[in-house]
Amino acid sequence: MFNNLTERLSQSLRKIINKGRLTEENIKDTIREVRKALLEADVTLSVIKKFIQNVSKKAIGHEINKSLTPGQEFIKIVKNELILSMGEKNHDLNLSIQPPAIILVVGLQGVGKTTTLVKLAKWIKEKYKKKILTVSTDIYRAAAIKQLQILSDQVKIDFYLSDTTQTPINITKEAIEHAKLKLYDLLLIDTAGRLHINTEMMNEINTIQNISKPIETLLIVDSMMGQDAINIAKKFSASLSISGIVITKTDSDARSGVALSIRHITGKPIKFIGTGEKLHQLEPFHPERIADRILGMNQVISLIKDIEEKVNQSQVKNLTKKFRKGDDFNLNDFLIQLKEMKNMGNLNYFIEKFSKNKILSNNPLLGENKNTLNRIEAIIYSMTHKERMHPIIIKGSRKRRIALGSGTKIQDVNKLLKNFDNIKKIMKKIKKGGIGKMIRNISNILPKNF
């Protein structure tokens, strides 16, 4: 969803990155290119106008942070405005109420409403350890009730079986009573969608909302609908008390205008985004992380977070110690980390995250599959202990011997050594000035083909 905007903004901001100072003249072309990028992303015109005005005002005559170049400062201003457009901070679910807390899920037909409800139930169950019940009030769409039942069963969440001969109002009342009787912490109510908004639909949802008194009413919108999604959200917000928005299908090729516009237009926070079809692919919406993603900065941070969830804490601590001791990190340590990566199970998931980053996508250490890591392992195993501890001694004849012993080419050995050296440089930056300083200087550390 954000890839096209990332590409366009990267092209626009590249022109200003090395400027000695920010002036109205030298940012004019960049501002124009940023505006075009936002238009192509289908961002609402009123949002673009405000965005460009704020960036221009803050950039010209802005006091530059001494640790940043003017170009970096401009990118920081753009990032901050992206965050402001999307809502500044993450808005968590409000579950602080006497059980059962009720979440009402609304939206048009075909936006992924039922699937999103189950994803949300799964996420809440795993994070908060709640006892959860789901129910469908959609008596109009064929197999809607059965769909929710099947999906709920897949994630081992209880389902209240309703009947198409009942009214949505009666189903709601009965499900609430059942949730109270069986001491459920949370009840998620799926409502009927329509192909378009109409008075009958809104009246029904309003009645369900008045009866159930939900602590959250979440509007589900499809990112692929573009400006139509914005208009639909506006109409729902005018008719219902919406507490938040969930944007689905953000893994698609849809333009990113919905995410950048919907908060400004509706005044309602984006609470979650759907990142794929599978039932675990739902993420809390963090404006700062999305801004980093749009500007191409988030892959490393996101990968570290995912790795922390995959490995045990002792492994994380050991990795962190080595990571901070840049001078002590050698090819033996690197080999251990390669083995851990291979043992994580879902290696392709991590590689995919890196492959989306323009800076890192050409890195031979992040090959296409496990075979690449096997090849790197073979190169390191063909080295002597001394060579692994002190890679600097590996010159012409040693490289030929290592390539021959590992069944690879000298170029492969050169690439491994070059990229290992880059990793050590990054670690030294972290050791000296912390991660923040390393990120600010990352463009000076990495070669263009890294």
UniProtKB/Swiss-Prot annotation:
InterPro entries: AAA+_ATPase, P-loop_NTPase, Signal_recog_part_SRP54_M_sf, Signal_recog_particl_SRP54_hlx, Signal_recog_particle_SRP54_M, SRP, SRP/SRP_N, SRP54. It is found in: Cytoplasm. The keyword Zinc does not apply. It comes from the Bacteria. GTP binds at residues 107-114, 190-194, 248-251. One of its GO terms (cellular component) is signal recognition particle. It holds the Pfam family SRP54_N. GO terms for molecular function: 7S RNA binding; ATP hydrolysis activity; GTP binding; GTPase activity. Its main location: cytoplasm. Its EC number is 3.6.5.4. It catalyses: GTP + H2O = GDP + phosphate + H(+). GO terms for biological process: SRP-dependent cotranslational protein targeting to membrane. Keywords: Cytoplasm, GTP-binding, Hydrolase, Nucleotide-binding, Ribonucleoprotein, RNA-binding, Signal recognition particle. Involved in targeting and insertion of nascent membrane proteins into the cytoplasmic membrane. Binds to the hydrophobic signal sequence of the ribosome-nascent chain (RNC) as it emerges from the ribosomes. The SRP-RNC complex is then targeted to the cytoplasmic membrane where it interacts with the SRP receptor FtsY. Interaction with FtsY leads to the transfer of the RNC complex to the Sec translocase for insertion into the membrane, the hydrolysis of GTP by both Ffh and FtsY, and the dissociation of the SRP-FtsY complex into the individual components. PANTHER family: SIGNAL RECOGNITION PARTICLE 54K PROTEIN SRP54, SIGNAL RECOGNITION PARTICLE SUBUNIT SRP54. Composed of three domains: the N-terminal N domain, which is responsible for interactions with the ribosome, the central G domain, which binds GTP, and the C-terminal M domain, which binds the RNA and the signal sequence of the RNC. Part of the signal recognition particle protein translocation system, which is composed of SRP and FtsY. SRP is a ribonucleoprotein composed of Ffh and a 4.5S RNA molecule. Belongs to the GTP-binding SRP family. SRP54 subfamily. This is Signal recognition particle protein.
